Amino acid sequence: DWDDLRLGLTRDRDAWVADLKATQLGGTLRLPDSPRVQPIAARLTRVDLKALSGDAASTRPPEAEVPDLADEARTDPREVPALDLDVEQVQWGQADLGRLRLVTRARPDGLDLAELSLQGPLGGANGSGSWTQSADGSGAFGAPVTRLAVEGKTADLGELLRRLDFASAVEHAPAEATMSADWPGGPGDFALARLDGRVGFEVGAGGLLEVEPGVGRML
């Protein structure tokens, strides 16, 4: 749900243009008449992911209880509009995560993730990928599959975790993370239990804040 939403609509030559103002976000949205040809263009000044997520994380089933895709509605990526998204400031509550660029392009079997970039005061991430209908040996389209390759860096892992509301005993430690993986279904079907690929994580030299003795022995 969006709080205090104000919406204004105007008609352009070949698109509707929406002016959005809410507690969680603000900006403009251009909805073309042919979104597979012209992408939906979103130019947002800010998006608060914490406010948008609400209680979704607390109600999501644990990994062991992730339902089979056969029991879920499957979206055909060949029917999903292309998107050109620019967010000046992505927030998690009061934390500034940086500027987000996300661009998808239509292809015959689905969508390409042509650009994914988040650059902020504590680091950034870049990625690419696709969401397509897989083809069998006869050339017929089968189930959808999502592929994603992402690289991320931060100059201070502990501070980043704390800004995201995670407890962290690490300070002044740089970190790098990489992922190259695919999973059945769409981007929203991501789950560790479905993942096929590689995930890497490296933490550089840093310091530990005061921790409990048991935690210190473990480290």
Tell what function each PLM region has.
Residues 64-78:
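N-terminal leader/targeting segments and the immediate start of mature chains
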Residues 9-18:
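N-terminal mature ectodomain segment of secretory-pathway/periplasmic proteins
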Residues 1, 6-8, 21-26, 33-62, ...:
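Small-residue helix/turn framework positions
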